[in-house]
Amino acid sequence: MELGLILMFASAFVSAKDRELEEFVEKDIKVFFSSYPAQVLGMEEDQGVLVSHSKYVNPSKYKFVTRARLVKSGERYVVIFGENNICKEGNSVVKCKEERPWDIDRKEFGYTISTDNKCITKGPDESIEMKPCVNTDDQIFGFKLADLGGCGSVESLLGSEKPKSTTTNVNIFQPESECLPSVMIKADGDVEKIEENDVHVLHKEGAHTHVIEEAGHPLYEESAPSKRRVVVSHRTKRSHLPGTRRTYLGHHHFPHHHLPHHYRNRTLFERKPVVF
């Protein structure tokens, strides 16, 4: 029973490993060190050797191609950088024309790439060496789709491809009117300051009524004359609060079609008291 469970889990692990690696087969990918994600593998075209460079270097300056591809060959994989296969030659990895498949094995934090029991290993500086597989950090690699990592064609990696322009679609909706239909907004320069001498008491009407004529322009109005008459009627009524007086404002002297909107307050028309 225990042996059956072990075989089942082993089979599930191998299946999961195969499915994960299959995501990168026959696709443009980037190969990087799992423990050094800023260090990527690439082919130096002038020397024809596999090296490690920082992903921040200018590919056109170093003629350094990071676009890679895995092609399945039986249970192994042909590894291609740029347009060239890579092969083991002594303790180095070089470009070659013939197909020499590699073993790609799943480890806890990535993959090893090996042949003849030797793994691709990070050497001093940017060099790459072939050393016995010991599953150390300098032998464990990760894969990433080139499109997601900002890597594209060989031309883009060499800096010879023209940059592609991008377009952002923005929908702009123009309002039917820039202002509310019943409100015209004046600029600050059109607003005149009301001076004290712009308000004149013309005459008193009765003991508790007087007429005030004032000049000035409100900031928001439909159409208002330069001068308007305001009738304030004072009617003393008994207040619920001691020491307060209620004043009612009348509106019968306003022409209806010239009424500014701020005088069209419901409290004015309904003659509700204003408590001072």
Swiss-Prot record:
Protein known as: Uncharacterized protein ECU07_1090
Keywords associated with the record: Glycoprotein, Signal
Domain of life: Eukaryota
Glycosylation sites noted in the Swiss-Prot or TrEMBL record: N265
Organism, as annotated: Encephalitozoon cuniculi (strain GB-M1)
Source lineage: Eukaryota, Fungi, Fungi incertae sedis, Microsporidia, Unikaryonidae
Cleaved signal peptide residues: 1-16
